[in-house]
């Protein structure tokens, strides 16, 4: 059983990635289920987001775990959030991206409103972590500790030392391996954090960086590399999914 906990669909900088493309690529790589957020959210294309997730659900049913990517604009306007929440899609996670939407870091009241949406839906919060300071894993430590009753996922685990510190300090936190260097994955294993790791690939964003590599091949290669690092611990991590619990 392999669950890809970090997948995208929709419009991105390199063009459009259709639900069929994503479904076929993941299945061809041997993936059994996926947690998916639509990158069309960044263009505030709410109808497209719902259409894309519905189509993926038609392909995979309960194998598809829809993630609702929230933007500040969605919470400021009257219609987007109610539209998404009443779309009959069973959202199983909330995503926040502080690099794409830096207002999250400047407006704590708005951030708390987003976290309230996750609390209302009783779903985990996926936080993009990256190389820009606004999205460093350590920047989220206070927020995570202040909301100890909620579950958080540090997407990518960057920088890894900060991600490890948050994981060791906050028992309500996981990390996903999307675009994570194998050396960082090894550090998580050495810290005894294998039970907090969620396998993820960030497909099909690989096409931005590795245009010549088919997405299904990229996913399969990521699976193979992960097996080499995790050994007999791999099966437990590949099958772990906290969305929809």
Residue ranges and their predicted role:
Residues 93, 107-198:
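Catalytic pocket-lining loop regions of alpha/beta-barrel enzymes
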Residues 32-33, 47-124, 171-173:
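Active-site gating/metal-coordination segments in enzymes
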Residues 2-5, 35-38, 67-69, 95, ...:
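Active-site neighborhood of phospho(di)ester-bond hydrolases with catalytic His/Asp-centered motifs
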Residues 5-8, 14, 21-44, 63-71, ...:
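Divalent metal-dependent hydrolysis catalytic cores, especially in the metallo-beta-lactamase
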Residues 2-11, 126-130:
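Histidine-centered catalytic micro-motifs
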Residues 1-5, 16-34, 119-120, 194, ...:
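Mid-to-C-terminal alpha-helical segments outside catalytic/metal-binding sites
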Residues 192-211:
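Short acidic/histidine-rich active-site segments
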Residues 11-18, 40-48, 71-78, 101-106, ...:
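Acidic-and-aromatic substrate-binding clefts and catalytic sites of carbohydrate-active enzymes
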